Amino acid sequence: MAGLLSKERSIAPADYNRWRVPVASVAIHLCIGSVYAWSIYNPPLTRVYGVVTSAADDWSLSAVVWVFTVAIVSLGLAAAFAGKWLEEAGPRKVGVVAACCWGGGYIVGAAGILTHQLWLLYLGYGVIGGVGLGMGYVSPVSTLIRWFPDRRGMATGMAIMGFGGGAMIGTPLKEFFIRTFYQAPEYLGAATDVNLVTEAGRRFAEVSGTLREVVVVGATEVRDMTVPGPEGVYVCLLYTSDAADE
């Protein structure tokens, strides 16, 4: 593997068609440019527990919106330091590390969502993923410029076009996957038909003899649901058992 990623192995033969390089470079930048579609994640992240609307223990919008900022700052810092390493190691090695960081950042961030640990989301998507963004940004740009010394402006423009276009492609893709894998929580009925108990700022309803935390969706919240559903009472995806057992 080390030999395959070495700088020497990335030297193309003399008859290589240089117009293949922009295609790969733009594709890479389209992928990492999807970071600009981060805002699609904000609403679902504020209702991880409630799913249809925010529950008492869900993250606030102000708590999750800064993940994007951390990712962009990490991008800039990584790009600044990756340039020198790129000259020494070559684009293949830098590109593979970038892919591992970008993909690994998603995995760590997903673990943070699953365990409801906000710091893991910041570490994964913000820091690790951001480092992957930075290294993934400089590698195609540097390679393009080397292949097009006579058209440096055009080469840089193609790479930036891909990075900027990432949001255009990433936004509908992310919306599609969010809707595809969306699972509506259990619906208990209209708020007037369910016996609700409020404790410590949380709402509970008796389900099969057990108090379970619920959220109440009104006309305003219905408009913000990932997939439209009826107004009423929904069981939280995860609920605080300690409060329910009191």
Q: Over which residues does each language-model region extend?
A:
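Hydrophobic core of transmembrane alpha-helices in multi-pass small-molecule transporters
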Residues: 118-134
